[in-house]
Amino acid sequence: MVKVAVAGGSGSVASEVIDQIVARKRHEVTILEQRPTESPCADKQGIKWIQVDYSDKSSLAQVLRGTDVVLCFFTGLDYMSAVRNSKNLIDASIQAGVKRFAPSEWGSRLNWSIPHYRFKDEIREYLEECNKYTIFQPGLFTNYFGFPYSTTRHLSMSPWLIDFDNRRAITVGAGDFSLCLTTVQDMAFVVAEALEYEGKWPVDGGIRGTQITMAELIRLGEKLRGPMRVESVSLEDLREGQLKSSWCPLLTHPCFPDEHREIISRHIMITFLRSVAQGAWTVSDSWNKLLPDYKYTSAEDYLTQIWMGKP
């Protein structure tokens, strides 16, 4: 049995991972949260929920004593809080004798070009000085391109720049920039497997489902959905903070006020397109090599299952 503490365990990605761990019925999961609310997973057997104060390292270390693995799912919407809470969690984990630590990554390989991800780079530097850790990096979740259809219990869904539902897409230049797509189900499975992996965890914990260019993904969309209206934007305009397209996907998130939703969505899409062009979403296959028997769901298989036969 592995004792796992999940920091920020009420989020949608964390909940997908927790479900996969609990389904194995051989691990003990503790969800750590600052607010007196429960994770969607908290009704499951084998989970306990503890309210913590991330500013109090000594009490946090006491909670973590006896824990084998800490998985962190903090968001970076408040940069200073994310950095402070992450560092305190790392310090408390070391003090408590935690063996393995996974910081709040769960996405891109490079974070500096994505404002709400920048705290992750500071935490990587901090971890290099003081702890053994792995960075789980699945790239972008394939599931997003199935919007509005969901195949998971928890993952928050929004339309994206390649919009299969409305047969339209926005790309950078000719769309020859690569990104990695991995289903959230595959990522959650790999994390659960990693808990039981007896070898050394890699620092670079890439999880590679499908490596694909934006142009190839658009062609897949046209194969499944018919012709798409494709708009190309320039990297130069993106660098100047401009998205010169006739539309922009509107993202939904509990932290996005309705009155600012369009502005926030446009900003996120600009930074996402820039980061794709900079190679931020191409990840390694470290965990693929360590778990060679696991078969990942390809982007084509997943999206065919979602879209084939849809009007």
Predicted regions mapped to residue ranges:
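Terminal hydrophobic/aromatic helix or amphipathic segment near a protein terminus
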Residues: 205, 218-280
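Conserved Rossmann-fold cofactor-binding substructure of NAD(P)-dependent oxidoreductases
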Residues: 43, 48-69
